[in-house]
């Protein structure tokens, strides 16, 4: 009786220890768990009729509908969304036998894969396919609690998320706008550079032509000056020659007049006439020679005059060409002024481009600062997530330790139970041995008693 009482105490102690371990394990999810009525009310708020009785005795189709609503709300995924991919996968796997797996089961399996990702994000790491097909009250309370808390957390952080999202969208839109403006400015700058290069080539060509025309103009001016000097010199020589010719002609006329006057006197003396004739012949020859020379000189002067006329015409053509060149030079000056204005406009555009580049750099720096702030917020969120993960890991370690302690205690209990069973067996054997020894001792006692009685009887007979 005492032994059985001790065994019952040990059994009650193991049950209490097992209950404490289970209680510590459940305390890990105590902060996340919600009452049944609150869960049913939240599901009713989303438009799905649901009661606490439905949670206690769950219907798989109803539970799948609730899960589908949460998946559509948080991930925009439904049965219809996964159907094309699952049908294509079934065609690839099944080949000529696509109906091996029913369509509903196939879509439910694909929906389960997407839903498991959502559960992992919500903190439910042990979500299984059985939770969809054969849900239980305890599992549904845990899963719905995590889901509802996740949705509440998301709704509570919606302004912050929207604010950062709107800021990032505005920054992105501003970047796109600045990038488009930058591209437009670069195109305009490239077009201006092309125009500048084309204008520079034209300006260089015009400058080269201008230099050539200036050199030719200077040469023509020098030639004109030389021709003008030659013309003046020839005109002066012509005037002088004409004067000399007139003088010679006048002398010849006077000489002839004198000859006519002296002719009567020459008839008086043959010798004197002969002498006079000889003298006159000589004078005549000299005069003829001079006249021939004068005629030659006149012809030369006429030739020079014709040459001067041709040269004068050439000079007039050169003057006209110079006028054309001056007009071209004026046009060149206009082109140069226009090119200078274009250069000024290009420099102004370059200044505008530099201002745009400075604005772009400023916006890039602002973008970098916003990115740094976003990165800081992301790091803070990551640090918080890491802290939560670390806390979760600590809780998991504690849970693991508790499980190990529980397993160790269970093993210890098992060893003690085995020892107790062995001790009980030994005690039973010992009891049996004692009882057999008592029985044998009793038999021996009876035998000795019978022997003693027999001996006493024989002693009495002998007496």
Swiss-Prot record:
Location(s) in or outside the cell: Nucleus; Chromosome, Centromere, Kinetochore
Residue ranges with Basic and acidic residues bias: 337-357
Pfam families from the UniProt entry: Nuf2, Nuf2_DHR10-like
Signal sequence residues: none
GO BP terms in the entry: attachment of mitotic spindle microtubules to kinetochore; cell division; kinetochore organization; meiotic chromosome segregation; mitotic spindle organization
Main location: nucleus
Chain residue ranges for the region called Disordered: 1-29, 330-357
A single cellular component GO annotation: Ndc80 complex
UniProt KW Cell membrane keyword: no
Compositionally biased residues, Polar residues: 1-14
Coiled-coil regions listed in the entry: 166-455
Classification via Gene3D superfamilies: Ncd80 complex, Nuf2 subunit
Molecular function GO terms recorded: microtubule binding; protein-containing complex binding
Source domain of life: Eukaryota
Keywords, sorted A to Z: Cell cycle, Cell division, Centromere, Chromosome, Coiled coil, Kinetochore, Mitosis, Nucleus
Function of the protein: Acts as a component of the essential kinetochore-associated NDC80 complex, which is required for chromosome segregation and spindle checkpoint activity.
Family note: Belongs to the NUF2 family.
Subunit structure comment from the entry: Component of the NDC80 complex, which consists of ndc80, nuf2, spc24 and spc25.
Designated name of the protein: Probable kinetochore protein nuf2
Lineage: Eukaryota, Fungi, Dikarya, Ascomycota, Pezizomycotina
């Amino acid at each position: 009786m005492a032994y059985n009482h001790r065994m019952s105490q040990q059994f009650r102690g193991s049950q209490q220890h097992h209950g404490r371990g289970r209680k510590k394990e459940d305390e890990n999810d105590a902060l996340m768990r919600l009452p049944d009525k609150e869960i049913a009310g939240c599901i009713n708020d989303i438009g799905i009729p649901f009661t606490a009785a439905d949670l206690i005795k769950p219907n798989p189709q109803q539970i799948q509908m609730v899960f589908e609503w949460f998946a559509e709300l948080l991930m925009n995924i439904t049965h219809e969304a996964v159907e094309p991919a699952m049908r294509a996968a079934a065609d690839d796997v099944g080949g000529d036998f696509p109906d091996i797996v029913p369509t509903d089961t196939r879509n439910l399996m694909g929906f389960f894969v997407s839903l498991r990702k959502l559960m992992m994000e919500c903190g439910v790491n042990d979500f299984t396919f059985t939770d969809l097909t054969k849900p239980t009250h305890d599992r549904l309370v845990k899963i719905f609690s995590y889901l509802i808390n996740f949705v509440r957390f998301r709704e509570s952080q919606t302004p912050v998320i929207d604010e950062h999202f709107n800021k990032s969208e505005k920054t992105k839109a501003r970047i796109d706008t600045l990038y488009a403006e930058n591209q437009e400015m670069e195109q305009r700058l490239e077009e201006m550079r092309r125009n500048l290069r084309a204008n520079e080539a034209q300006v260089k060509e015009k400058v080269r032509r201008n230099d050539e025309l200036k050199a030719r103009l200077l040469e023509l001016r020098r030639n004109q000056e030389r021709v003008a000097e030659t013309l003046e010199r020839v005109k002066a020589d012509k005037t002088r020659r004409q004067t000399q010719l007139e003088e010679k002609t006048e002398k010849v006329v006077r000489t002839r007049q004198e000859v006519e006057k002296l002719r009567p006197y020459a008839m008086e003396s043959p010798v004197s006439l002969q002498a006079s004739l000889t003298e006159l012949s000589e004078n005549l020859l000299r005069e003829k020679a001079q006249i021939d020379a004068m005629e030659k000189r006149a012809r030369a002067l006429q030739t020079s005059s014709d040459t001067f006329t041709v040269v004068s015409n050439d000079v007039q053509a050169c003057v006209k060409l110079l006028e054309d060149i001056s007009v071209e030079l004026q046009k060149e000056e206009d082109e140069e002024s226009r090119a200078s204005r274009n250069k000024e406009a290009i420099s102004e555009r370059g200044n505008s481009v530099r201002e745009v580049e400075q604005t772009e750099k400023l916006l890039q720096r602002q973008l970098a600062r916003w990115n740094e702030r976003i990165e800081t917020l992301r790091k803070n969120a990551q640090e918080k997530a890491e802290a939560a993960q670390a806390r979760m890991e600590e809780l998991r370690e504690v849970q693991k330790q508790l499980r190990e302690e529980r397993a160790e205690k269970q093993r210890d209990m098992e060893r003690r139970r085995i020892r107790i069973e062995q001790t009980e067996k030994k005690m039973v054997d010992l009891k049996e041995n004692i009882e057999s020894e008592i029985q044998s001792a009793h038999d021996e006692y009876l035998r000795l008693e019978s022997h003693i009685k027999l001996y006493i009887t024989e002693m009495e007979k002998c007496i």
